[in-house]
Amino acid sequence: MGYLGEFEQLILLALARLGDEAYGVTIRDTLEERAGRRPSFGAVYSTLRRLEQKGLVRSFLGEPEAVRGGKAKKFVVLTPRGRSALRESHAAIVRMAEGVAGLRR
C-alpha cells in the first residue's frame, strides 16, 4: 500500500466515521468538528479524486433533492483497500509514537 499524507488520512477517517452519509459538506463539517480544520471544498474534492484514483474510495450519485432543480449529492465510501490503507497508516503512526515522551495524554 502506498504512503498516505496527513490530510488523506483525515479524509479517510471522516469517511469511516460518516459511513453512508459522507459527501463534501459532511466531510468538511466532520474535519472541522473532530480535527479543528476547515479546509476549502476544493481541497476536499481534489483529495477525494486522488483517493478514488488510488482505489481507496468509491463515489456514487444519490437521489436528487426533492426541490425544484434539486441536485444529486455525490456520496463517497471507503473501499476495502481504503480501509486497509487507513489501518496500516494508523498502525505505523502508533508504532512511531510508541515510547516518545510527551505524546500520551
Residue ranges and their predicted role:
Residues 81-105:
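Amphipathic alpha-helical dimerization/coiled-coil segments
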Residues 3, 49, 66-68:
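Short secondary-structure boundary/capping segments
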Residues 2-43:
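N-terminal helix-turn-helix DNA-binding core of bacterial DNA-binding proteins
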Residues 29, 52-53:
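Alpha-helical residues within the helix-turn-helix
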Residues 72:
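Exposed loop/turn and edge beta-strand positions of beta-sandwich/beta-sheet ligand-binding modules
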Residues 12, 75-77:
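Short aromatic/hydrophobic contact patches that present stacked aromatics
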Residues 44-51:
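Basic amphipathic alpha-helical segments that dock to polyanions
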Residues 54-69, 77:
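Beta-hairpin "wing" of winged helix-turn-helix
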